[in-house]
């Protein structure tokens, strides 16, 4: 995969491309794309017997404060295969801190033209409460058995905050390339 040729989205920060690394409900394996080669590597096998609560990936041509592309979860009724690109819109953000610093996770749903099931979801609060609880629980505990790794779950943010974080991550990536 030539990640450098995949745009941020067709209308960022409203509509973003998310490159999926881990499918919802998949085996407890953390995959990660090598941005230079485009190859999908096994980053690690989770030490906790937990499955990802949503399709997990990143937004290309963004840069988070931790030095990685902006992470995104895409809520959907189906798992997406690793390596696929999903057009999604951010509806919120979960602010985390881990051993590397701040680590925001965008919460997204597929754009209506891809899957209109979530067309009435404009904010994370529009999702069933249990979905948000599962996401928070997963990130609070998925590193529990890994030595020298930790996570602190912070506050949830709304769609406006998610869009602002995306704008800042796009700008940070542009500055890093300059």
Where are the regions a protein language model picked out?
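Hydrophobic N-terminal alpha-helices or hydrophobic patches in metabolic proteins across all domains
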Residues: 1-178
